[in-house]
Amino acid sequence: MESNNKLKRGLSTRHIRFMALGSAIGTGLFYGSADAIKMAGPSVLLAYIIGGVAAYIIMRALGEMSVHNPAASSFSRYAQENLGPLAGYITGWTYCFEILIVAIADVTAFGIYMGVWFPAVPHWIWVLSVVLIICAINLMSVKVFGELEFWFSFFKVATIIIMIVAGIGIIVWGIGNGGQPTGIHNLWSNGGFFSNGWLGMIMSLQMVMFAYGGIEIIGITAGEAKDPEKSIPRAINSVPMRILVFYVGTLFVIMSIYPWNQVGTNGSPFVLTFQHMGITFAASILNFVVLTASLSAINSDVFGVGRMLHGMAEQGSAPKVFAKTSRRGIPWVTVLVMTIALLFAVYLNYIMPENVFLVIASLATFATVWVWIMILLSQIAFRRRLPPEEVKALKFKVPGGVVTTIAGLIFLVFIIALIGYHPDTRISLYVGFAWIVLLLIGWIFKRRRDRQLAQA
């Protein structure tokens, strides 16, 4: 099946732009936003703006290195080259584990969503179906993957735009509200804009940043981009404003139509908005959207882990068999391994006690922030490693240079502190540090084996 170990560049600027955009629009917006609103009130809008700025800093740092050295293993390779082999090893495996956990949640969610329409069909049938379908998609050419991901993301984005436009119609003209405009007074009528104080807004930041998780896939696409020097900068520069529009715009509409303390209490914010327009089948519309979102997420999950493991295998941080590719340039071994892992993980998800799964899911939050911190540290070390003339010649530099990166780093450390401060998420720090210790033990055994092979 395999012909060599090379990936093929088949992703266009259009594919990469929508992949980067779609990766940050998922359950964090469709469901997680309700919890963030409860925590911060209307000031959650400010939290999403602050989080968007931090996400942009992370993307620019990754983009600077990706344009200079496009690699499928992306931030794992950059960590290895700039911080050392151990940093690359831990970062790569932590990212893979993070995405696997997220993928477990996504495939399980797909079964639940389909159960809304077909309650008599067991969920495991839908879960098995979507895993096999996504596996087949990822075994095709990367161009097919990119095209499907483009349309998945397109449907998500189109639905959000329709909801924002419809919401503005309710706010300004009272469409669907008996001709009575709702206005925007709900943003300050129920306890003020900072209804839960500054602390409420600050505490919501950890949830906001998790909602932006997935943006780092833009770096992984660099290894298969046709023209990374053009496509990566265009994708990165276009995404932040769009994300801010979709998140901030959507929540602005929702909280203008409904008092913030009622959002999420009688159903999904998206369902409530459509129902307010007089659309009785709002639940089905939302269900189609979240189904598309979960398909997009699973598709990107398998793609991301496959490319990361392929790159790590080439670096010597993962088994060499993961470096094998098909004639189409697809890392088929990693795709099959991810598929098998998903099938086994879905089974575990059904038999696992709820609190245990919460612990594992919490690790994804820690792992996301960990990967972002390693990206920023790698960029700082990358800049220090280059002579001044090469720094000046960089084609996609971070605005403000290392100073901006350090500011982003301080912010992420603050997010980790928030995770530890909040009782519901504190356990993720314990589990996260335990994961790092396990990787360190694995690294020790790996180095010992490498020395033995070198002496043989």
Curated annotation (Swiss-Prot):
Keyword Transport listed: yes
InterPro entries, per database record: AA-permease/SLC12A_dom, Amino_acid_permease_CS
Coiled coil segments of this chain: none
GO BP terms in the entry: amino acid transmembrane transport
Major subcellular site: membrane
Keywords: Amino-acid transport, Cell inner membrane, Cell membrane, Membrane, Transmembrane, Transmembrane helix, Transport
Subcellular location: Cell inner membrane
TM region positions: 18-38, 39-59, 96-116, 117-137, 157-177, 198-218, 243-263, 278-298, 332-352, 356-376, 400-420, 425-445
Ranges in the topological domain labelled Cytoplasmic: 1-17, 60-95, 138-156, 219-242, 299-331, 377-399, 446-456
Membrane topology of this protein: Multi-pass membrane protein
Family: Belongs to the amino acid-polyamine-organocation (APC) superfamily. Amino acid transporter (AAT) (TC 2.A.3.1) family.
PANTHER family per UniProt: GABA PERMEASE, THREONINE_SERINE TRANSPORTER YBXG-RELATED
Name listed for the protein in its UniProt record: Proline-specific permease ProY
Lineage, opening ranks: Bacteria, Pseudomonadati, Pseudomonadota, Gammaproteobacteria, Enterobacterales
